[in-house]
A protein has these predicted regions:
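N-terminal beta1-alpha1-beta2 submodule of the flavodoxin-like/Rossmannoid cofactor-binding fold
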Residues: 1-80, 85-103, 154, 160-177
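Short, glycine-/small-residue-rich phosphate/pyrophosphate-handling segment
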Residues: 107-151
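A short, flexible beta-alpha/helix-coil linker loop
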Residues: 126-129, 159-163
Length: 177
């Protein structure tokens, strides 16, 4: 199974990394896993140029290799902290660039812009003790993935990480996904 992890935290050893690490310990050794660090990838933001309204892809070519990996994956893991009730900027820029699939589906009437069905999971960390950020991110992911032949099937919210980091129960739940 090809698993693509979209890692949205700037901290490679913070709470999101710990939650992602617990998930990775729970997957099969035979799985092919790639972690894409979005703060390193630095997706160029969408500027509404309209290219994807009429053609496949995007006028910006910085994500072509990434999009090919995404389309080929069997599973997509969105691992992100909550920033102001949403994603950090590079994750948001990436999700905005998924507009190419929205336009293909709704404007150009391509039933499944991504032919390979895939499953997705959310691994979300939040410094506070609220569910609001997770709920907003979950809705954004579900709606974006709905035109990408990708089904969100579960997730873990590790909240209150500003007070003691990721809890053992959250690590266990990520491992068991």
């Amino acid at each position: 199974m090809k698993i693509l992890i979209l890692f949205g935290s700037p901290k490679t050893n913070g709470s999101t990394a710990k939650l992602t690490g617990a998930f990775m310990k729970g997957i099969r050794k035979s799985d092919d896993v790639e972690i894409v660090h979005l703060f390193s990838l630095q997706p160029t933001p969408c500027n509404a140029c309209g290219y994807c309204k009429a053609a496949n892809g995007c006028s910006k070519k910085d994500l072509e290799k990434f999009m090919a990996k995404l389309e080929d994956a069997d599973a997509v893991i969105v691992a992100t902290p909550v920033y102001n009730l949403s994603f950090p900027a590079p994750m948001k820029a990436l999700f905005d660039r998924f507009q190419r699939y929205y336009e293909a589906h709704f404007r150009r009437k391509i039933a499944q812009p991504i032919t390979k069905h895939k499953k997705a999971l959310l691994l979300v960390t939040a410094g506070d003790d609220e569910d609001d950020g997770y709920n907003i991110i979950e809705k954004q992911v579900k709606l974006s993935f709905s035109v990408m032949n990708t089904e969100l099937v579960g997730g873990v919210l590790a909240k209150d990480t500003d007070n003691g980091g990721v809890k053992e129960d959250d690590l266990r739940r990520a491992f068991e996904l």
